[in-house]
């Protein structure tokens, strides 16, 4: 179900693709960033590719190897040849690369990935769009207030968007829980909105509702009991 945040993520990726630039999408977990990216990748299978970074794949070698596999580019033994192969595959195309959990990327990996947005100085072919998605650590690092190398990277960001749980809208809850909207169960919706706007985010609210639905009781009282049972705790109603 598209929400205001996942739709904004979708359009931001499209912007990076059209402008061949770097975009950073960051913020709280569980608000729909990855869902928006997944929808874009599904809708554009021929000119969009996504990879997800972990602490063990954040190095330059691991990152470009993941990218090569995603693009079906033959893997090379050294990093220079691998980057040349990637550029040969990407330059002049309308590809966009979406990197989730980008806060795990090391500086060298960030710099190489960013370079893919540059025009090729030899052929003049334009670069591609790159989208970094992660928690706000990725943007804080790129701001580089204390590290000149990150400050240089920061200056190449065309657009950044911050998504927090507080930005979840009542309309999002109506879309996510249509049964409650049909029943005009305002108290239930307000409670789920309070969960969405808490550190548990949309993901937490969805899990809460799913558990309540499994018990065949999505009443306000049962949602509240289920929240306490799940450790979500006492939340004030918005």
Where are these regions (language model features)?
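Walker A/P-loop nucleotide-binding motif
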Residues: 18-39, 55-56
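Pre-Walker A adenine-sensing motif
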Residues: 2-17
């Amino acid at each position: 179900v598209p929400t205001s945040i996942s739709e904004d993520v979708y359009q931001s990726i499209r912007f990076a693709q059209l402008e061949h630039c770097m975009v950073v999408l960051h913020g709280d977990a569980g608000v729909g960033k990855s869902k928006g990216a997944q929808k874009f990748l599904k809708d554009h299978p021929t000119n969009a590719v996504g990879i997800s970074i972990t602490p063990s794949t954040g190095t330059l070698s691991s990152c470009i190897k993941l990218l090569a596999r995603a693009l079906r580019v033959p893997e090379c033994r050294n990093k220079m040849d691998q980057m040349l192969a990637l550029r040969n595959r990407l330059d002049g195309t309308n590809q966009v690369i979406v990197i989730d959990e980008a806060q795990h990327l090391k500086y060298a990996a960030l710099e190489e990935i960013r370079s893919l947005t540059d025009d090729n100085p030899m052929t003049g072919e334009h670069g591609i769009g790159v989208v970094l998605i992660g928690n706000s650590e990725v943007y804080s690092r790129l701001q580089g207030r204390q590290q000149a190398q990150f400050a240089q990277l920061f200056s190449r960001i065309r657009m950044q968007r911050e998504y927090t749980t507080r930005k979840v809208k009542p309309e999002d809850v109506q879309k996510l829980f249509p049964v409650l909207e049909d029943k005009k169960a305002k108290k239930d919706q307000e409670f789920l909105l309070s969960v969405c706007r808490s550190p548990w985010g949309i993901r937490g609210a969805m899990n809460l509702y799913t558990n309540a639905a499994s018990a065949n009781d999505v009443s306000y009282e049962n949602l509240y009991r289920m929240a306490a049972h799940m450790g979500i705790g006492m939340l004030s109603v918005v």
